[in-house]
């Protein structure tokens, strides 16, 4: 079949790769000049199968209230005259119910675990390198309440085959010695040796280059404007670019991987996708003392930040701001990243020359992504992965390719079906 994939972030590029593997004629449409120049550009770098706790949990409403008015709060809700934002917020509160929280966690775990397996197979088959490390992820807790809740979550994922181990402060230091200067901060941690890290941008651009060698066409610099519908099927994609002007592209099947912009494309044809942008920040810092810098990726639960080594750089990322589609850098939130990096690893990194970045992560209220077929039989979605797009990318891409090909995906997940 002829398939159009809309978007060349890590989700769209992996989708295109697996569609091509299954024999389809694939074209990817991307508004930027290369793959991975938007949401996948400078994320936290974690491939975190074990960290599946949704933002929407029974404690979340109280935490958000506590953080109101704090410019550097880990999760910041800025109310707007935006119906989509309020619909999202109300559904988020519903997803905080204990029964829904557990169901969502199991869905996230299923697709994340599967995706980790697919990524390992893909790396073995292609030999891709992307500043990847297989050293695990260590989640640090600075208060007893958070540590106790993490221990319960770790027990749940262990029941499903993920070896997330509860660690004392001393054991955390043994796993990652660069934490030793702040041992008195640490109440405990959880560690998953099977989790990985890597540069999502490098991975995506390398995979796109391989996909081109295998026949996938990437139409860069081309913006998707709208979808055409004929009867009960999508009949084309209206695009525009500087070179060709306006163009109508047609295919047998269409896969929308447009991150936070997915709802804007779908609403005119009557397809609802409750996805809202969660603005995240990162700072990339040069490593000045490699021996003092972490090699195990660290998640600081109190500040909702991650620290990931990517070659000779340390990526610090985190926070979520529900404030619309603006990409302006907030100095307070940027400085919070470098301040925390300095507190943990000040001797190891250059915090005076950070490279700041912000991107819009496509969040659903449940944190469960939207993967599968819409009410139009030839229109598929692969979006809504929130902070776990890198983690879920390979599994999501392969699953969508299976669905387009009429195959049953190899993972037990609640795929969309009309």
Language-model segments: which ranges?
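Glycine-rich FAD pyrophosphate-binding loop
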Residues: 21-41
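Active-site substrate-recognition segment that forms the wall
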Residues: 43-46, 51, 55-95, 180, ...
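Helical element adjacent to the flavin cofactor pocket in flavoenzyme catalytic cores
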Residues: 148-160, 180-252
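C-terminal lid/capping helical subdomain adjacent to the catalytic/cofactor pocket in oxidative enzymes
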Residues: 166, 179, 200, 229-231, ...
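Dinucleotide-binding Rossmann-like beta1-alpha1 core, especially the glycine-rich loop
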Residues: 44-169
């Amino acid at each position: 079949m002829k398939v159009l994939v809309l978007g060349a972030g890590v989700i769209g590029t992996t989708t295109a790769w697996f569609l091509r593997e299954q024999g389809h004629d694939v074209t990817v449409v991307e508004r930027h000049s290369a793959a991975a120049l938007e949401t996948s550009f400078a994320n936290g770098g974690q491939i975190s199968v074990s960290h599946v706790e949704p933002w929407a949990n029974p404690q979340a409403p109280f935490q958000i209230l506590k953080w109101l008015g704090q410019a550097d709060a880990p999760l910041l809700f800025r109310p707007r005259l935006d119906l989509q934002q309020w619909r999202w917020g109300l559904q988020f509160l519903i997803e905080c119910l204990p029964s829904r929280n557990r169901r969502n966690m199991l869905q996230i775990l299923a697709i994340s675990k599967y995706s980790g397996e697919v990524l390992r197979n893909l790396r073995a088959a292609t030999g891709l390198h992307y500043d990847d490390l297989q050293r695990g992820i260590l989640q640090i807790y600075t208060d007893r309440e958070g540590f106790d809740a993490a221990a319960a979550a770790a027990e749940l994922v262990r029941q499903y085959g993920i070896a997330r181990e509860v660690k004392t402060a001393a054991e955390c230091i043994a796993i990652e010695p660069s934490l030793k200067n702040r041992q008195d901060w640490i109440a405990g941690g959880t560690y998953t040796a099977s989790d990985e890290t890597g540069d999502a941008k490098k991975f995506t651009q390398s995979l796109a280059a391989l996909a081109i060698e295998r026949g996938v066409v990437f139409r860069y610099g081309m913006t998707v404007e709208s979808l055409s519908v004929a009867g009960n099927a999508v009949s084309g994609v209206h695009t525009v670019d500087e070179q060709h002007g306006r163009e109508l592209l047609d295919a047998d099947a269409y896969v929308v991987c447009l991150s936070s912009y997915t709802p804007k494309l779908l609403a005119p044809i009557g397809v609802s996708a409750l996805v809202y942008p969660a603005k995240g920040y990162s700072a990339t810092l040069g490593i000045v003392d490699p021996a003092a810098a972490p090699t195990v990726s660290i998640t600081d639960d109190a500040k909702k930040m991650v620290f990931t080594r990517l070659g000779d750089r340390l990526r610090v990322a985190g926070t979520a701001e529900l404030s619309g589609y603006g990409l302006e850098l907030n100095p307070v939130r940027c400085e919070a990243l470098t301040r925390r990096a300095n507190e943990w690893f000040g001797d190891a990194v250059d915090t005076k020359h950070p490279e700041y970045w912000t991107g819009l992560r496509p969040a659903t209220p449940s944190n469960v992504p939207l993967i599968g077929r819409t009410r139009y039989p030839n229109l598929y979605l692969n979006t809504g992965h929130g902070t776990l797009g890198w983690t879920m990318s390979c599994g999501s891409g392969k699953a969508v390719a299976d669905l387009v090909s009429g195959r049953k995906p190899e993972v037990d997940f609640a795929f969309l079906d009309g």
